[in-house]
Amino acid sequence: MKLAYWMYAGPAHIGTLRVASSFKNVHGIMHAPLGDDYFNVMRSMLERERNFTPVTASVVDRHVLARGSQEKVVDNITRKDEEENPDLIVLTPTCTSSILQEDLENFVERASLSTQGDVLLADVNHYRVNELQAADRTLDQIVQFYIQKARKNGDLLEEKTAKPSVNIIGVSTLGFHNQHDCTELKRLMADLGIEVNEVIPEGASVHNLKRLPQAWFNLIPYREIGHMSAHYLEKEFGMPFVDITPMGVVETARCIRKIQEVLNAQGADVNYEEYIENQTLHVSQAAWFSRSIDCQNLTGKKAVVYGDNTHAAAMTKILAREMGIHVVWAGTYCKYDQEWFRKEVSEYCDEVLINEDHGAIGDAIARVEPSAIFGTQMERHVGKRLNIPCGVIAAPIHIQDFPIGYKPFLGYEGTNQVADLVYNSFTLGMEDHLLEIFGGHDTKEVITKGISADSDLGWSADGQAELNKIPGFVRGKVKRNTEKFARERNITEITAEVLYAAKEAVGA
């Protein structure tokens, strides 16, 4: 077991609550000690919604530890059922309260005897899985529960819609640009003449889950959430699914061609080639931009990519294939699905990194000194310390990644957003130099280029002054070489003389 003060993917109960609070009229109850109950605050702060987060903490305190939880948990479930009238209540422990080894399944059965709505215990092993795996499993559990319930009641709708239709599975609260992606996917489906049957879990009613089998196919835009549900629906009803993330011009076209293949296999007669060509050449600016002089200035520049599987893989392909940028390494924190990631990106980058230790990722960035980083909020912090620009492409995210304006990452409008993000992330040619000349950023001190906080070197006033005379675009490199030179010779304070000596040593 390892103590972590930064996690890329949160604990399992966060994933369960993300799915529960994405549905309409579903209430989540977490059986948790104080400290594990931060989901409400986090969601209320980040998601730009007017409604309260439908999650209640059933707090594990000293009274519970003395008497057991049954009475309190059952009371909380029945009280919330009376107050909110939810269609479904999802109970989840946290990894901390799981230690108590209580029979929560029994509590749920007891509570459901006196509730109007359904009650479910999240079927998740809190020690074995993280937020993303738990979200996928909880969505699958809820889908299965309501499909089986409809089957039992005899009101399961299995007859296909007259026109081609789709279920979009995996759009959830607190996802990276998920709301905007969903809007863009709906537009894309409308352009292709495909009706959207259901979007789950975001904004969906659990009573509509019985309508899922009516769609012609399922679209899984994100690798992390929705796969288990898609496999279940395929097994039960023979429903095909498309799991190509339409991010970037090439992958969007590949996704549309796969949809065409799936529809034509079911008796439709569609041809989307003209649409793909029109969008690529005339509507999406990304294809034109990648041939422009602006983008050609980026050719061969070094970048690193890190994030969840979906976004890191898609971004690596866009940079390497569509923009000619040299991806030195691509990494993911989704260790549980690393085989897929390796297969997707290995031909587009020099090195594949599977690691969830933010310190190791920071050191890997410092080691290769890229021109730009594409990662999570943590890599943005690393970039600030290293004075390397960073574009955020994946969760974990902060309030600025929930923009008010329309910024999808998927579909053809998404290609424009990604192109902007890439171009704006690289420092423009004369920018640093002009800032130096006109005295911009004059409060900015040159900071260490190591991430691990073990630097034992100091710069004297004359050494710092001499360093500041060096143009910004090479200053970082000179500073690192000088510090390396000083460490090798056990020098603790770097003066102007040490800087000159280091320069000579490198020159020699």
Curated annotation (Swiss-Prot):
EC number: 1.3.7.7
Keyword annotations from UniProtKB, A to Z: 4Fe-4S, ATP-binding, Chlorophyll biosynthesis, Iron, Iron-sulfur, Metal-binding, Nucleotide-binding, Oxidoreductase, Photosynthesis
Residues at which substrate binds: G429, M430
SUPFAM superfamilies (UniProt xref): Helical backbone' metal receptor (SSF53807)
The keyword 4Fe-4S appears for this protein: yes
Cofactor: [4Fe-4S] cluster
Molecular function (Gene Ontology), one example: metal ion binding
Residues at the active site: D294
Catalytic reaction list: chlorophyllide a + oxidized 2[4Fe-4S]-[ferredoxin] + 2 ADP + 2 phosphate = protochlorophyllide a + reduced 2[4Fe-4S]-[ferredoxin] + 2 ATP + 2 H2O
Matching Gene3D superfamilies: 1.20.89.20, Nitrogenase molybdenum iron protein domain (3.40.50.1980), Proto-chlorophyllide reductase 57 kD subunit B (1.10.8.550)
UniProt pathway: Porphyrin-containing compound metabolism; chlorophyll biosynthesis (light-independent)
Cofactor binding note: Binds 1 [4Fe-4S] cluster per heterodimer. The cluster is bound at the heterodimer interface by residues from both subunits.
Binding of [4Fe-4S] cluster, residues: D36
Biological process, per Gene Ontology: light-independent chlorophyll biosynthetic process; photosynthesis, dark reaction
Domain of life per record: Bacteria
A Pfam family annotated for this UniProt entry: Oxidored_nitro
HAMAP family: ChlB_BchB
Function in brief: Component of the dark-operative protochlorophyllide reductase (DPOR) that uses Mg-ATP and reduced ferredoxin to reduce ring D of protochlorophyllide (Pchlide) to form chlorophyllide a (Chlide). This reaction is light-independent. The NB-protein (ChlN-ChlB) is the catalytic component of the complex.
Family: Belongs to the ChlB/BchB/BchZ family.
Alphabetized NCBIfam families for the sequence: DPOR_BchB (TIGR01278)
UniProt subunit comment: Protochlorophyllide reductase is composed of three subunits; ChlL, ChlN and ChlB. Forms a heterotetramer of two ChlB and two ChlN subunits.
Protein name stated in the entry: Light-independent protochlorophyllide reductase subunit B
Native source organism of the sequence: Acaryochloris marina (strain MBIC 11017)
